[in-house]
């Protein structure tokens, strides 16, 4: 009886202790997901390096996903830390294990993925395109792909689309390639290892000129939502904050401005121009690459930006000459050559050095309060149309209620300089401002292509073996 009484006392004491602990936990609950982020002072975002998400250019890290994630981190008053992976399986594992707070990797929110991940509202919608060689058979329906070789990245939304298509066309077969990037899959098609692959329309838009022998003329799926992914086991505090941010970003034009920044300079595809660029990338650029890299050290500009400028000016032809007398790789005037202290405009070394130096001098005149990349795009416009005319465009931008320190606003006013009704009210008069806008757009396009041609090392490193 005494022993039973002793056990009862222990049981009552344990129950009392548990009650106290329960009360303490109720009074001091575990911090929420957003509170944990605020406490550590950083937001951890997992992404895939690509031209549509996250990459490095002359101004540092950038990309549509990166800029959105950076904006969200800033809105919460915390630092942004980026983790990278090309492995879709690891990405899903990492978010569920808490390795990252958010996945911002250009993921399409599919019904299958939504079973294991919590997705935000879409920040962008894309089409899924079927890519083939120009010499391959054009299809009008997926059922026509029977007996054709198709490769997609393993575990991707593209694989899900093809699995769904198999329900209606059981003979449709495809291969899933582990951790394959879009560039690797495009290389497989170009080299004839497979007949087709799938690609998101935003990715194809940015790199189409790198693959002039490929075409995407069949749409597999339309308006697929690109979304951020969250751990469904977490409370919804972080998710709700992200939802508010993305909704506001759409409402206040932030998302639209980012789309214009990353896609607005991509002009209509020109097959001849693309093939010429790829040919010159192989047979001309290597002759001058070291000179551009030396100019980078001297000027501080990314050598690929200088190379893009030179391609716009001369197609990397040191003997190029215009009807107005400008000549050389950087197409310098006699006056500019004298200013920069060179004697032979057709000498590649002198021309590149002088062109880079002149761009640096022009860039230094742009007010340093103007953030990048707007400051560089304005410097390029001034390089083309003259600094005074650029300043006129900025004055006009301010008069019309725009931001004179933002390239997106200024480029809308530059074409107005050609109209006397506007130019007569400005200091420097009329100018071909629309030409300057096109000039900057072309250079940005060539620069993007050079960055991605190098980053993906498509010539040697993107060819992968199929299982």
From Swiss-Prot:
Listed GO MF terms: peptidoglycan lytic transglycosylase activity
InterPro entries reported for this sequence: Lysozyme-like_dom_sf, MltF, Solute-binding_3/MltF_N, Transglyc_AS, Transglycosylase_SLT_dom_1
One Gene Ontology cellular component: cell outer membrane
Enzyme Commission code(s) on record: 4.2.2.n1
SMART domains in alphabetical order: PBPb
Main location, first listed in the record: membrane
GO process annotations (BP): cell wall macromolecule catabolic process; cell wall organization; peptidoglycan catabolic process
Keyword Cell membrane: no
Subcellular location: Cell outer membrane
Signal sequence interval, chain numbering: 1-33
One Pfam assignment: SBP_bac_3
Keyword Membrane annotated: yes
Spans annotated as Non-LT domain: 34-266
Keywords assigned by UniProt, alphabetized: Cell outer membrane, Cell wall biogenesis/degradation, Lyase, Membrane, Signal
Residues at the catalytic site: 313
LT domain: annotated segments: 268-467
Gene3D superfamilies: 1.10.530.10, Periplasmic binding protein-like II
Superkingdom field: Bacteria
Function: Murein-degrading enzyme that degrades murein glycan strands and insoluble, high-molecular weight murein sacculi, with the concomitant formation of a 1,6-anhydromuramoyl product. Lytic transglycosylases (LTs) play an integral role in the metabolism of the peptidoglycan (PG) sacculus. Their lytic action creates space within the PG sacculus to allow for its expansion as well as for the insertion of various structures such as secretion systems and flagella.
Notes concerning its domains: The N-terminal domain does not have lytic activity and probably modulates enzymatic activity. The C-terminal domain is the catalytic active domain.
Family: In the N-terminal section; belongs to the bacterial solute-binding protein 3 family. In the C-terminal section; belongs to the transglycosylase Slt family.
Protein name from the UniProt record: Membrane-bound lytic murein transglycosylase F
């Amino acid at each position: 009886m005494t022993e039973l009484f002793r056990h009862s006392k222990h049981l009552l004491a344990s129950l009392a202790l548990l009650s106290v602990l329960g009360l303490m936990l109720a009074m001091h609950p575990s911090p929420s997901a957003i509170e944990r982020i605020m406490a550590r002072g950083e937001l951890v975002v997992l992404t895939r390096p690509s031209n549509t998400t996250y990459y490095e250019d002359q101004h540092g890290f950038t990309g549509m996903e990166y800029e959105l994630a950076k904006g969200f981190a800033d809105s919460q008053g915390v630092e942004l830390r980026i983790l990278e992976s090309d492995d879709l399986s690891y990405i899903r594992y990492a978010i569920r294990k808490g390795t990252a707070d958010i996945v911002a990797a250009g993921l399409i929110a599919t019904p299958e993925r939504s079973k294991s991940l919590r997705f935000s509202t879409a920040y962008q919608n894309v089409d899924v395109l079927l890519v083939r060689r120009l010499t391959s058979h054009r299809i009008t329906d997926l059922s026509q792909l029977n007996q054709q070789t198709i490769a997609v990245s393993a575990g991707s939304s593209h694989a899900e689309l093809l699995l769904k298509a198999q329900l209606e066309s059981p003979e449709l077969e495809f291969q899933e390639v582990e951790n394959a990037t879009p560039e690797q899959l495009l290389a497989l098609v170009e080299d004839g290892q497979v007949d087709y692959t799938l690609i998101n329309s935003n990715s194809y838009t940015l790199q189409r000129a790198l693959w002039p022998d490929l075409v995407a003329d069949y749409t597999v799926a339309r308006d697929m939502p690109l979304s951020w992914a969250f751990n469904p086991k977490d409370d919804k505090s972080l998710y709700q904050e992200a939802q508010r941010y993305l909704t506001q970003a759409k409402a206040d034009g932030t998302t639209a401005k980012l789309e214009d920044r990353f896609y607005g300079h991509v002009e209509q595809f020109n097959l001849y121009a693309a093939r010429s660029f790829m040919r010159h990338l192989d047979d001309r650029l290597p002759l001058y690459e070291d000179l551009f890299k030396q100019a980078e050290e001297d000027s501080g500009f990314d050598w690929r930006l200088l190379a893009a400028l030179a391609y716009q000016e001369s197609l990397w032809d040191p003997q190029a000459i215009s009807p107005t007398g400008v000549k050389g790789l950087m197409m310098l005037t006699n006056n500019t050559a004298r200013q920069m202290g060179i004697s032979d405009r057709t000498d590649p070394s002198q021309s590149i050095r002088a062109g880079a130096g002149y761009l640096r001098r022009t860039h230094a005149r742009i007010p340093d309060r103007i953030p990048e990349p707007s400051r560089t795009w304005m410097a390029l416009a001034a390089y083309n149309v003259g600094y005074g005319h650029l300043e006129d465009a900025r004055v006009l931008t301010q008069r019309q209620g725009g931001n004179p320190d933002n390239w997106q606003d200024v480029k809308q006013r530059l074409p107005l300089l050609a109209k006397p009704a506007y130019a007569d009210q400005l200091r420097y008069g009329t100018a071909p401002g629309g030409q300057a806008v096109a000039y900057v757009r072309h250079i940005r396009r060539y620069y993007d292509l050079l960055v991605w041609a190098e980053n993906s090392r498509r010539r040697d490193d993107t060819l992968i073996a199929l299982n």
